[in-house]
């Protein structure tokens, strides 16, 4: 599997964390999030990949939306910020465990 494919898989697996990170301190509409992900990771998400997750995050009260000049703008809630911090801690730990595992069993 190529490095690009691994990165794409990781971003899609942890897309909720990526979205909460992008919205942390910024309000943004969906297509701008797609552009930010493309800029930061080189991955072009389809709206069909993004919008169902935005609705799920909104239903779970992790983000909220408002209409602004005909566009839906999303922003993170205090509950979303708390969830983001917890998920980041868990993600960092899992990366550390995986890195140690790879070091122990030999890198190629």
What are these regions (language model features)?
Residues 7-49, 62:
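N-terminal helix-turn-helix DNA-binding core of bacterial DNA-binding proteins
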Residues 51-56:
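Short, hydrophobic-biased segments on the C-terminal half of alpha helices
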Residues 58-69, 75:
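Beta-hairpin "wing" of winged helix-turn-helix
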Residues 82, 86-108:
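Amphipathic alpha-helical dimerization/coiled-coil segments
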């Amino acid at each position: 599997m190529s490095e690009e494919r691994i990165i794409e898989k990781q971003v899609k697996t942890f897309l909720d964390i990526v979205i909460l990170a992008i919205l942390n301190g910024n309000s943004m509409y969906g297509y701008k999030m797609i552009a930010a992900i493309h800029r930061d990771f080189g991955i072009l998400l389809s709206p069909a990949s993004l919008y169902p997750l935005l609705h799920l995050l909104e239903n779970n009260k992790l983000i909220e939306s408002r209409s602004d000049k005909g566009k839906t703008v999303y922003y993170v809630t205090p509950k979303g910020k708390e969830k983001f911090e917890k998920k980041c801690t868990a993600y960092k730990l899992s990366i550390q465990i995986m890195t140690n595992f790879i070091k122990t069993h030999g890198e190629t």
